């Protein structure tokens, strides 16, 4: 399946997911109001309390051949106390099933894609939905260097500037940098609705993809103990914990630095594989080509 079709499947899944989450929040709000006057307001669980009660009503209704209204009355349920509420929960379950269907369609589409088959499936912690995000939004034809993948996912660094827009330097005269965020906007070229090149100021990266890679994939890889990338994470984390420049930073800061480094290495390897698979030129990284540094994993 083409990446455009995977992107459409992915967006449809997230639309369904957003509607399901909004509906679940609304249901919890509705059922929580029943206990507003209680001194000890219970913590309501959608799965444990409401959905299990829904199944209980269904089972009783079928076994006793009674109406929904009569079943609710006989069971003296705590949460679902009317046929209207029963139907609202029933509609929510339909949303759950729809989301599962869209997930299966997306998985089927991704599992036939060569990038998933030959690269992403080997990474422990990277499932089909995460793979879909990567395949749908990264383009090896547009990315002439691995750093383009880093920039598009917001994992490049930005030179820090003062209030006058001047670069800030440290005591050694080196530019101070920071991780890219939503406040870091730049002018860039884009194709307008008339098909013409134009310039506008805005984000140069995909914030949603960044949050997926750092907030979800990175932690999944570490928990799954992927033999390649979790090692990169722990090696880099140990390294910065012993560097004078970084050793006094908080543990969470060091953890975030190590996760970003790990994902950047993953994206670099992905870029190399994908460019070769598409018979496109592959270049050395900036650190190797321009700074004469050894590549990651070099045996010193």
Residue ranges, per PLM feature:
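A glycine-rich phosphate-binding loop feature that marks nucleotide/adenosyl-phosphate handling sites
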Residues: 125, 166-167, 172-175, 286-292
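Eukaryote-specific, cytoplasm-facing alpha-helical/coiled-coil scaffolding segments in long proteins
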Residues: 42, 238-245, 288-300
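Basic, amphipathic alpha-helical segments enriched in Lys/Arg and hydrophobic/aromatic residues
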Residues: 250-287, 295-298
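Phosphate-backbone recognition surface of nucleic-acid-processing proteins
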Residues: 119-120, 134-256, 260, 273
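Short, hydrophobic/amphipathic alpha-helical patches that form generic packing surfaces
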Residues: 4-25, 29, 132-137, 211-219, ...
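Coiled-coil termination/hinge junctions
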Residues: 98-131, 135-140
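Conserved aromatic-histidine-acidic binding/catalytic patches
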Residues: 4, 8-11, 15, 90, ...
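Long, charge-rich intrinsically disordered scaffolds of nucleic-acid metabolism proteins
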Residues: 1-112
